[in-house]
């Protein structure tokens, strides 16, 4: 058995464990309540056109409302209304042209992309036509935009077209700034307290959970993104890409943490890089590579073409999606194998069993809540084409944003609390390291939770004398 720095987990009673979970749920519930009361994420403004049943469509020029950096991004979508029976189903492809111009504050027109972009889009109508994304700007350089859209090659009887501008709600942007700042400050404090509590113990004596927490807490700081306000100060794609990169790094590190802990808690002593870490890094690294590739791919292509959508314009997207799902399935099976094996082998070891049960219980709660949030957001179509794309930094309401951030932050804070040593941990560890004092005449429950006799007051020595007399009589 490897020497371990003590954890507060060992000194908690059953009552304290219940209190830890209650505090976790209260904090998580507060974030959801604030999110429900918060503003909408997306604000829209519509511009409708009557085309008088003309089959010859001319280019349509659309001017956006005045924008600020708090609008973050800009989408232009279109819903086509056909002049035919609603029972008719149509699916046809047609080339669509788009030209985007920026309007400066003095009213002059600046050419963002001094050319007309041409992409093939699919119009799907079953009673009502599906929405088409015309253009998307990942960051805003100008206070207003003009988009010229061409549907000249759409050979269908058109009754009308409904164009909609979509941007982030400035009120939500301010909420996002303040709550990210709150979590950044709170995570920094928790990280410092956790490091301070372990300062008296050699890193060689840290448990695998404590070592991983020293990695996850700084990554959680990046996940909350202290550089996020730069996206409102600098007109650049870099802050948004950094945010995507930080999120993918933390989430994949969390996946790696689960694999390493459930395996490492069973393999005490030296953990070789080749046999212990390499397979886990390989599986999680593939997931990280797939998510980062899609994010960078989308960002770089949108810089040159506002019509670009990797779900529509990338022939390899289906292959990427299948690859991601296969690797995710391998990860889940491997994790379940490690959990089942650890639970079967360590269920009779008091200290290790306690670590295993607590991590499994809290992680199970977090995963159930996460799956519930995803189901409420996507419904039964959670594994359709929009799944990977929508799991990025885009949210549909404030409650969704705060629930995800609050869930992961409070999960790490709870783990940091139970894995950090208590105030008297150094003295207690010195006693436990001495075989003469370690678990002498104590059962497993007494060691973890304390016996009733230990909590009994001395009563001027009467209790001890009475116990000694009973033992003498029995002899």
Swiss-Prot record:
It is found in: Membrane. Keywords: Membrane, Phosphoprotein, Transmembrane, Transmembrane helix. GO terms for cellular component: membrane. Its main location: membrane. It comes from the Eukaryota. The chain crosses the membrane at residues 16-36, 131-151, 175-195, 214-234, 245-265, 276-296, 320-340, 356-376, 401-421. GO terms for molecular function: toxic substance binding. InterPro entries: TMEM181, TMEM181_GOLD, WLS-like_TM. Pfam families: TMEM181_GOLD, WLS-like_TM. It is a multi-pass membrane protein. The modification Phosphoserine is found at residue 443. Belongs to the TMEM181 family. Interacts with cytolethal distending toxin. Mediates action of cytolethal distending toxins (CDT), which are secreted by many pathogenic bacteria. Expression level of TMEM181 is rate-limiting for intoxication. This is Transmembrane protein 181. It comes from Homo sapiens (Human).
């Amino acid at each position: 058995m490897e020497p371990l720095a003590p954890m507060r987990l060992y000194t908690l009673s059953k009552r304290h464990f219940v209190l830890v979970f209650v505090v976790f749920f209260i904090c998580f519930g507060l974030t959801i309540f604030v999110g429900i009361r918060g503003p909408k994420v997306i604000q829209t403004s519509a511009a409708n056109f009557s085309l008088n049943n003309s089959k010859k469509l001319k280019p349509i020029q659309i001017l956006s409302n005045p924008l600020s950096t708090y609008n973050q991004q800009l989408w232009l979508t279109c819903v086509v209304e056909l002049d035919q029976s609603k029972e008719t189903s149509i699916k046809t492809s047609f080339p669509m042209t788009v030209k985007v111009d920026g309007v400066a504050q003095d009213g002059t027109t600046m050419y963002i992309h001094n050319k007309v972009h041409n992409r093939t889009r699919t119009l799907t109508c079953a009673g009502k036509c599906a929405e088409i994304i015309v253009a998307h700007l990942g960051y805003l350089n100008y206070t207003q935009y003009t988009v010229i859209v061409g549907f000249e090659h759409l050979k269908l009887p058109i009754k009308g077209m409904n164009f909609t501008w979509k941007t982030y709600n400035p009120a939500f942007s301010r909420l996002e700034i303040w709550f990210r700042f709150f979590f950044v400050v709170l995570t920094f404090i928790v990280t410092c307290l956790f490091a301070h509590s372990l300062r008296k113990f050699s890193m060689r004596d840290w448990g695998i959970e404590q070592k991983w927490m020293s990695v996850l807490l700084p990554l959680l700081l990046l996940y909350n993104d202290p550089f996020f306000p730069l996206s409102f100060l600098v007109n650049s794609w870099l802050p948004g890409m950094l945010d995507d990169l930080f999120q993918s790094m933390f989430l994949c590190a969390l996946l790696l943490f689960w694999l390493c802990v459930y395996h490492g808690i069973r393999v005490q002593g030296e953990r070789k890089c080749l046999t212990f870490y390499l397979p886990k890094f390989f599986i999680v690294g593939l997931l990280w590579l797939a998510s980062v590739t899609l994010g960078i791919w989308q960002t770089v292509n949108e810089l040159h073409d506002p019509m670009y959508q990797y779900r529509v314009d990338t022939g390899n997207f289906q292959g990427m999606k299948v690859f991601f799902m296969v690797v995710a399935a391998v990860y889940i099976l491997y994790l379940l194998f490690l959990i089942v094996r650890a639970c079967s082998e360590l269920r009779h070891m008091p200290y290790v069993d306690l670590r295993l049960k607590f991590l499994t219980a809290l992680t199970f709660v977090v995963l159930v809540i996460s799956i519930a949030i995803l189901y409420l957001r996507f419904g039964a179509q959670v594994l359709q084409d929009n799944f990977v794309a929508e799991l990025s930094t885009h949210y549909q309401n404030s409650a969704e944003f705060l629930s995800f951030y609050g869930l992961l932050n409070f999960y790490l804070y709870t783990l940091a609390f139970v894995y950090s040593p208590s105030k008297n941990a150094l003295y207690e560890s010195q006693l436990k390291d001495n075989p003469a004092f370690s678990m002498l005449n104590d059962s497993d429950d007494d060691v973890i939770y304390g016996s009733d006799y230990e909590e009994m007051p001395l009563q001027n020595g009467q209790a001890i004398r009475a116990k000694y007399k009973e033992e003498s009589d029995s002899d």
